Amino acid sequence: MTLYSAALLLTTKLGPDGRHHRRHSTVGRGFHLQTAGVHHPNSGRSKYEVQVIAFSSELAIVSLPGEIFVELGLALKKASPFPHTFIAELANGSIGYVPNRSAYAEGNYEVVSARCAEGSGEMVVEGAVKLLKELR
């Protein structure tokens, strides 16, 4: 099964909170793919899909649709249960910059142009780590 065909198998469900939750898990030639995404229709929130792929008990890739700040990437790698965790940015689309919480006080270009609220970056890290732990 190709990564593309695995991604096409995603299902959509309406959760108890009224949000659409998509989650799929599959195993293919030497990898395990876990995908989760949340989208709240008519809320002004953006869809953000986090995808993790484990190739072994030692190696995982996290794909994110945006450019996360380095502090978030380092936090994700540190919290990952996989010794070798790689992050692919701008995967499955892009929502632009995803700053860490402390960057909002600085007001630099990336923060001003970001389409996500303060604290969103930390939520992305928490979600990715949760998915990684499910695979481990």
Q: What label would you give each PLM region?
A:
Residues M1-R136:
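Non-catalytic substrate/cofactor recognition surfaces at enzyme active-site rims
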